[in-house]
């Protein structure tokens, strides 16, 4: 169970999986108290009977994170190779999320892929209109003569995603690494 300032915000019975709660309505000006109550066993424990240590407690970080009213909520990158294993095939989907009170209804989302020297090998921008709580944008491209990822030479690219409003004000930016490889059984 999760409590903020003495009020229960939510609960989860799933261990080993992240849990997220919107605590906005429970916060106050100044210092706030975040408390977590952990039970050793619950009615679904038998379903989690897998091959791992059955330890109780917090195993990962617990933190509060503030987001703007419109933000990059999630993204998925798929980096593969063409049929001759020479060029990279890149696909990405980016989810934007609108929170209560958002006034930004239009903007631009930019995705850039940079090689290890910092050279931009793919750059795309998409305009968007916010109509629902979630908006998804898709990107795709081919990277010629891609530097492939493998265990001996783990070549990675940086993917940078930037969100701007319609007045060109930067709202959010996130980045991660991706590698191009293809695994198959023929």
What spans do the regions from the language model cover?
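Secreted/periplasmic carbohydrate-active enzymes, especially glycoside hydrolases
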Residues: 1-186
């Amino acid at each position: 169970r999760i409590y903020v300032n003495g009020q229960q915000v939510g609960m989860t019975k799933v261990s080993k999986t992240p849990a997220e709660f919107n605590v906005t309505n429970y916060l106050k000006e100044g210092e706030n108290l975040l408390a977590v109550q952990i039970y050793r066993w619950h009615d679904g424990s038998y379903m989690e009977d897998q091959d791992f240590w059955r330890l109780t407690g917090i195993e990962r970080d617990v933190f509060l994170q503030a987001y703007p009213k419109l933000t990059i909520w999630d993204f998925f990158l798929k980096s593969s190779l063409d049929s001759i294993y020479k060029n990279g095939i890149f696909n990405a989907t980016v989810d934007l999320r609108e929170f209560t009170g958002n006034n930004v209804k239009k903007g631009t989302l930019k995705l850039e892929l940079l090689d290890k020297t910092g050279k931009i090998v793919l750059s795309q921008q998409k305009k968007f209109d916010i109509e629902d709580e979630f908006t998804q944008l898709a990107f795709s491209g081919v990277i010629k003569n891609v530097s492939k990822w493998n265990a001996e030479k783990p070549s990675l690219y940086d993917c940078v995603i930037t969100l701007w409003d319609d007045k060109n004000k930067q709202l959010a930016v996130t980045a991660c690494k991706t590698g191009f490889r293809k695994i198959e059984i023929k």
